[in-house]
UniProtKB/Swiss-Prot annotation:
Binding-site list for heme b: H63, H92
Source organism of the structure: Sciurus carolinensis
Main function: Involved in oxygen transport from the lung to the various peripheral tissues.
Domain Globin span(s) in chain numbering: 2-146
InterPro entries in the record: Globin, Globin-like_sf, Globin/Proto, Hemoglobin_b, Hemoglobin_oxygen_transport
A GO BP annotation: hydrogen peroxide catabolic process
Protein name in the entry: Hemoglobin subunit beta
Subunit structure: Heterotetramer of two alpha chains and two beta chains.
Amino acid sequence: VHLSADEKNALATLWGKVNPDELGGEALGRLLVVYPWTQRFFDSFGDLSSATAVMGNPKVKAHGKKVLDSFSDGLKHLDNLKGTFSSLSELHCDKLHVDPENFRLLGNELVLVLALHLGKDFTPQVQAAFQKVVAGVANALAHKYH
């Protein structure tokens, strides 16, 4: 992902304000509610029968935190996203058979959640930088797909 020095600094500053415990679950929960067909990959998560159930589900929150922790790792390795996400790409492709389009959808939900929580600090310029990163991460996660 090609980012200017200003974009990298803005991302680092704003990412320091992010609470992965809270925002990861919210982003994943929104994915599962807005795109209900994505729920089929989460059969073991229990009750996903309503928006309230999804958003309050502790397994959704825990997995969302894992997702954001991985995203945080990606922010530290912007010059090597494919390498950083290689094992996760393999897992999601070969074992879990996740549609790679879901990575793009989740990235969009993450951007929405960041905008909601960061408010005026999430300027159009910051959004543009985050969009580049989530697109890069989605591409890296889809890399092992044939």
